[in-house]
């Protein structure tokens, strides 16, 4: 298979297919004196593709007998087909080299390469048919060859063009270039590939066989054979863990005690629910324990229901061995008379047959005493042994009720720790009862390597979960299970049933099924890595390609896609955010739906875990989220549907909300090191760690509230009020100082802002990706409230939450709207105080301003108050409708401080711009680039050098918070006006004023991604809005200039001739940030490509050998991260290409308008025929341009509608699940 990364690199590129024909004319080869070639062959090759000429004899020359030639009397034509790729904004195609090789063919038929030479096919590609004569010099590969040349003519014919991912643009030969094996990896296949009925029969046979073995422990030899079968069954999915063998011994040794307790079997409260827990896909209506045990719905459940399974759930201690319970049922029904005989049988120590180092002591497993019985004090060991397997399961299952009795999973808990953690028989019983009755829709857990989730196994489990109810779909691996395309179609139909009709699919039509699935995924923005021909031509599809494609699908539907926030020179310092623009621009789930569980929560009793310490809970949580903090994104089961939802109908947004809480906890666990640097943060960090660990309910509202509030409290410890007073004093003291001192105060303000804003990056994941998790996860409604609720008593309320979580949650829910309204009132009051304070500071200054200046300031104050009132109205409206917009956090306490600073800063344009931008930067955004944002002043001093940098930084600001575009114009206008009032007429200041005017024009109607409060999508501002306003502004300026110059026709023509150059300059400035960001993205892409090539090579080697599973897992995690980053870059470049298209259309539209206005200004009777024809041509071109513009607007509108439809579908799904969750939660109760 061709490189997966190569295919990923081609996403979003244009492709053109060419046919090249080489007509060989003459070949010259000069060799040494001691050797001459037999027959020569010219081979044209690339990778595994070879095009050979016929063998020709070498004829020595007359002048130089060592230099011979091969002449083709009739040119021999060799034909190849080449696909060339290029970026949408690039001028030329990417390099693609084909190699000519001269080979010597011996009489025996063996070939040896003599010389080689390569040509770059892009140099000969042309849209028009061309023919080029080429004389190629070769590089000798053998000491026998001195030199060689080849003369041929190369013809090029353009065939077709399209997207790089189109099926007809894929090279069929490249599919086979890796020489894929015809035999699949047997490790990918599971033992049971039959239908459910056959599986049921096999399970019954296995159960009967194990029962027969247990009943007939007469001969050690027969026991050994059956024991080997049990070992195989237990070790196939569990990576040959020693614990499975150990539990198997317990099964045999503790059987006598289990037989003694048979009287309590029928009253066992865990029997049926526990089987249901182990088989979340089984029939819930089934009552028979045997049917539950022997009727799995998935192929791998033969392992999970096996008696030797070391990961099976916690059972009652009455059996001493919790793993023989189902077989005990079978034994009672099949052979009750054998029970008396079994009491006389002796347990056998098999540790020496299974493994060398037994964890049992010699006293417990004494081989010399065949009548030795296990001590009855073993429940402690049993509980801890069970806890290991159970914890590994529940780490990924995350049952809704907190499993108090579970010990921390990182180190295996010794028996001495059992009393500490409160684990006894009663707690095991109660917890098992509660957990077993809880719904368990999550996928079956994957094997665990060092407490880290296995990325490939979790991905496989997710695929099984999503496709479990679809006919004809049986997923056991990442190769053959996907070949017929039904599995891909099932996933697509599960999330987007409107895109595919699953019932109409034919399982035999491999190509059509795959084509429908790939086209459907591509239509929703998932990079296309597979083609239908891949599955048709290859009996065993490439495993890594399929895994990568499925990972992209899961990331898309679970909201784990990355998006670019900030690009740095070093890829490791670049910042990405989790979530995509289409769905995360505003709140993804409204209050009513998000808190739907609260009604069920009230019915539940408060979790009772008095014997459990916060440190124990924290250690367990820390081990759960090791991968999240190490990789920077969830690659585990946390991306699967949450525990409260039915897996087949769980909304992706609910999955997103669930997975979004994981980084919160990973941040809190990592905050112990970063928070220790600041003594002011340490106390709240500790409380955050403790509070974030209260309970194991992933989606319970009190957990979300506690974790979010604690994270925000770490920030609030910096005392926003005192910081605000400091800033007020700073601004007041500097109001009557000169400009240099004001810059010092601004640097102080920037440092204060940095102290506040840098708190979040300190607790971000150690991967240095800088995900702004708290600000980016706007899908959680409570996330937007974090920064708004900055009242001094927030810490107290947080501590109260620790004692009364349910009560606090109810209180927070009731007071949420009142708090929003109160915040709006505070903003209004602050605006009034700002205006009064500014007027007072102006009067108290060293010089009284002029009357016009005061009037201007009053107007500015009025405008500022109007903006704040508008913002307050939005806050109140949002509070009433229960929808929190993602821009609310930026107007919290700190934002109000910055508004005040901005209202007091006078006479310096940079101060206004700087505060505006800082105001809109989300918290945690200053990741290595915060200092850049405050250097616009110095950049303006060197406009020629730094104009590109300024534009690029302004663009970054707009991307960080698009609302900044709405405030920049007024800020820039105010700055320009105040600068002119101060009377600074120097050339530098004039230049600043001119550049700021251009910035005002650019951002008055910005081409940025606006936010819509009702639709979560990327909304590029429509072209008509952008174009129709801007030419109008220039038109007014043009009319004024024409009035000044008079109405003479000559002046009019001069004006129109002079204008285009200014327009071109303006256009250049406007598009500069696009060019700058494209360059930054390309640099980032090169670094990622370099690393990905190495990772893919190493990963393929590890997957083939299977020797180092830990390194393979680490490489897999890194590979998935790189794929996610690559897709983020692809999406960003697509958005920039749309901006570029709009800009090109706008430029042509403007220039046509200019020329057409000049023509229309001439009276008809004065026009010549040439002018009339020219006018008609201009009108026609303008109409065509408008049509193109409308087409672009329609495309953008279609994208917006598609996003709306997707959101509506997800909301409907969430609404359907609401009732199901309520019913399931009613069944949960703690005792």
From Swiss-Prot:
Protein keywords: Coiled coil, Cytoplasm, Endocytosis, Endosome, Lipoprotein, Membrane, Phosphoprotein, Prenylation, Protein transport, Transport
A GO biological process held by the record: endocytosis
Keyword Signal among record annotations: no
Modified residues (Phosphoserine): 171, 174, 177, 222, 302, 307, 335, 436, 438, 442, 446, 646, 719, 765, 784, 1061
Location, primary (coarse class): cytoplasm
Domain Calponin-homology (CH) positions: 453-558
Free-text note regarding domains: The CAAX motif is a signal for prenylation and required for endosomal colocalization with Rab8 and Rab10.
Stated role: May play a role in actin reorganization. Links clathrin-mediated endocytosis to the actin cytoskeleton. May act as Rab effector protein and play a role in vesicle trafficking. Required for perinuclear sorting and insulin-regulated recycling of SLC2A4/GLUT4 in adipocytes.
Listed name of the protein: EH domain-binding protein 1
Organism expressing this protein natively: Mus musculus
High-level lineage: Eukaryota, Metazoa, Chordata, Craniata, Vertebrata
């Amino acid at each position: 298979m061709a490189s997966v990364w190569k295919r990923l690199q081609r996403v979003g590129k244009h492709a053109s297919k060419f046919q090249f024909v080489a007509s060989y004319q003459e070949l010259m080869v000069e060799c040494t004196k001691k050797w001459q070639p037999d027959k020569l062959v010219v081979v044209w090759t690339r990778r595994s593709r070879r095009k050979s000429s016929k063998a020709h004899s070498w004829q020595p020359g007359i002048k130089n007998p060592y230099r011979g030639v091969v002449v083709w009397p009739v040119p021999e034509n060799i034909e190849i087909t080449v696909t060339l790729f290029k970026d949408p904004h690039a001028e030329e195609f990417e390099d693609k080299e084909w190699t000519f090789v001269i080979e010597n063919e011996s009489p025996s038929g063996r070939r040896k390469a003599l010389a080689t030479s390569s040509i770059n096919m892009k140099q000969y590609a042309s849209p028009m048919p061309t023919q080029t004569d080429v004389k190629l010099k070769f590089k000798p590969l053998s000491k026998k060859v001195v030199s060689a040349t080849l003369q041929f003519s190369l013809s090029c014919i353009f065939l077709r063009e399209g997207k790089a991912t189109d099926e007809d643009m894929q090279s069929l030969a490249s599919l086979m270039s890796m020489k894929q094996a015809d035999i699949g990896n047997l490790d990918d296949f599971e033992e049971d590939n039959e239908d459910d009925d056959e599986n049921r029969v096999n399970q019954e046979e296995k159960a009967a066989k194990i029962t027969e073995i247990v009943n007939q422990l007469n001969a050690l030899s027969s026991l050994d054979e059956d024991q080997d079968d049990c070992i195989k069954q237990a070790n196939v999915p569990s990576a040959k863990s020693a614990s499975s063998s150990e539990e198997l011994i317990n099964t045999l040794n503790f059987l006598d005690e289990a037989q003694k307790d048979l009287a309590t079997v029928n009253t066992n409260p865990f029997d049926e629910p526990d089987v249901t827990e182990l088989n979340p896909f089984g029939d819930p209506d089934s009552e028979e324990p045997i049917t539950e045990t022997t009727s799995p719905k998935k192929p791998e459940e033969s392992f999970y229901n096996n008696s030797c399974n070391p990961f099976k759930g916690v059972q009652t201690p009455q059996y001493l061995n919790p793993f023989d319970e189902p077989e005990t049922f079978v034994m009672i029904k099949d052979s009750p008379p054998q029970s008396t005989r079994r009491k006389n049988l002796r347990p056998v120590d098999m540790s020496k047959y299974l493994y060398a180092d037994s964890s049992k002591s010699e006293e417990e497993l004494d081989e010399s005493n065949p009548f030795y019985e296990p001590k009855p004090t073993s429940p402690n060991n049993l509980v801890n042994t069970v806890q290991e397997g159970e914890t590994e399961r529940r780490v990924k299952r995350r049952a809704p009720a907190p499993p108090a009795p579970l010990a921390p999973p990182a180190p295996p808990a010794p028996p001495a720790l059992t009393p500490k953690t409160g684990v006894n028989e009663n707690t095991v019983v109660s917890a098992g009862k509660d957990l077993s009755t809880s719904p368990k829709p999550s996928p079956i857990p994957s094997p665990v390597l060092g407490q880290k989730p296995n990325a490939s196994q979790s991905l496989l489990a997710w695929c099984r979960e999503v496709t479990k109810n679809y006919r004809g779909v049986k997923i056991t691996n990442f190769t053959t299970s996907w070949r017929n395309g039904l599995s891909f179609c099932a996933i697509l139909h599960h999330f987007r049933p409107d895109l595919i009709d699953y019932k109409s699919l034919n399982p035999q039509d491999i190509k059509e099924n795959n084509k429908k699935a790939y086209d459907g995924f591509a239509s929703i923005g998932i990079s296309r890595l597979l083609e239908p021909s891949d599955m048709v031509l290859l009996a065993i599809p490439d495993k890594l390609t399929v895994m990568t494609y499925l990972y992209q699908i899961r990331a898309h539907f679970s909201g784990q896609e990355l998006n670019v926030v900030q690009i740095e020179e070093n890829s490791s310092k670049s910042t990405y955010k989790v979530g995509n623009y289409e769905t995360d621009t505003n709140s993804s789930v409204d209050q009513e739906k998000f808190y739907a569980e609260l009604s069920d929560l009230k019915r539940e009793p408060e979790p009772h875990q008095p014997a459990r310490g916060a440190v124990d809970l924290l250690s367990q949580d820390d081990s759960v989220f090791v991968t999240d903090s190490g990789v920077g994104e969830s690659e585990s089961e946390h991306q699967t549907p949450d525990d409260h939802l039915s897996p087949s109908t769980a909304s992706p947004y609910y999955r997103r909300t669930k997975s979004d809480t994981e980084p919160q906890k990973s941040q809190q666990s990592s905050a112990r090191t970063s928070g220790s640097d600041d003594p002011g943060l340490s106390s709240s960090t500790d409380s955050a760690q403790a509070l974030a660990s209260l309970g194991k309910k992933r989606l319970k509202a009190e957990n979300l509230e506690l974790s979010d509030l604690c994270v925000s409290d770490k920030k609030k410890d910096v005392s926003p009020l005192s910081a605000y007073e400091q800033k007020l004093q700073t601004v007041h003291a500097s109001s009557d100082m000169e400009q240099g001192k004001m810059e010092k105060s601004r640097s102080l303000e920037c440092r204060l802002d940095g102290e506040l804003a840098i708190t979040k990056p300190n607790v971000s994941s150690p991967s240095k990706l800088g995900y702004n998790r708290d600000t980016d996860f706007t899908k959680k409604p409570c996330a937007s409230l974090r920064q708004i609720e900055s009242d001094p008593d927030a810490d107290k309320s947080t501590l109260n939450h620790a004692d009364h979580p349910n009560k606090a949650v109810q209180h927070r829910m009731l007071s949420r709207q009142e708090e929003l309204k109160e915040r709006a009132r505070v903003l209004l009051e602050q605006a009034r105080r700002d205006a009064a304070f500014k007027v007072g500071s102006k009067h108290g200054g060293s010089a009284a301003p002029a009357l016009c200046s005061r009037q201007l300031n009053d107007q500015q104050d009025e405008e500022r108050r109007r903006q704040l009132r508008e913002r307050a109205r939005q806050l109140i409206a949002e509070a009433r409708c229960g929808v929190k917009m993602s821009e609310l956090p930026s107007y919290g306490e700190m934002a109000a401080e910055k508004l005040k600073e901005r209202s007091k800063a006078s006479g310096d344009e940079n101060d206004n711009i700087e505060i505006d931008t800082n105001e809109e930067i989300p918290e945690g955004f200053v990741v290595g680039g915060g200092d850049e944002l405050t250097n616009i002043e110095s950049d303006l001093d060197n406009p020629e050098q730094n104009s590109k940098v300024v534009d690029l930084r302004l663009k970054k600001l707009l991307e960080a918070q698009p609302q900044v575009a709405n405030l920049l114009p007024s800020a820039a206008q105010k700055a320009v006006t105040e600068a002119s009032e101060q009377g600074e007429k120097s050339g530098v200041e004039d230049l600043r004023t001119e550049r700021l005017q251009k910035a005002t024009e650019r951002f008055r109607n910005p081409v940025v991604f606006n936010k819509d409060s009702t639709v979560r999508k990327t909304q590029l501002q429509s072209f008509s809005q952008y174009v129709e306003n801007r030419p109008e502004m220039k038109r007014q300026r043009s009319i004024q200039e024409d009035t000044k110059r008079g109405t003479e026709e000559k002046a009019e023509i001069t004006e129109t001739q002079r204008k285009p150059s200014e327009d071109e300059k303006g256009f250049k400035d406007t598009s500069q940030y696009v060019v700058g960001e494209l360059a930054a993205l390309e640099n980032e892409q090169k670094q990622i490509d370099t690393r990905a090539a190495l990772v893919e090579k190493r990963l393929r080697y590890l997957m083939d050998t299977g020797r180092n599973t830990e390194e393979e897992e680490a490489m897999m995690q890194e590979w998935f991260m790189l794929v996610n980053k690559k897709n983020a870059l692809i999406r960003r470049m697509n958005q920039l290409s749309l901006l570029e298209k709009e800009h090109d259309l706008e430029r042509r539209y403007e220039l046509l308008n200019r020329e057409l206005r000049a023509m229309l200004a001439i009276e008809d009777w004065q026009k010549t025929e040439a002018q009339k024809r020219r006018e008609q041509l201009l009108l026609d071109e303008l109409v065509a341009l408008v049509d193109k513009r409308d087409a672009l607007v329609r495309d953008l509108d279609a994208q917006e509608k598609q996003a709306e439809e997707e959101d509506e579908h997800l909301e409907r799904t969430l609404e359907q699940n609401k009732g199901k969750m309520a019913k399931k939660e009613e069944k949960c109760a703690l005792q």
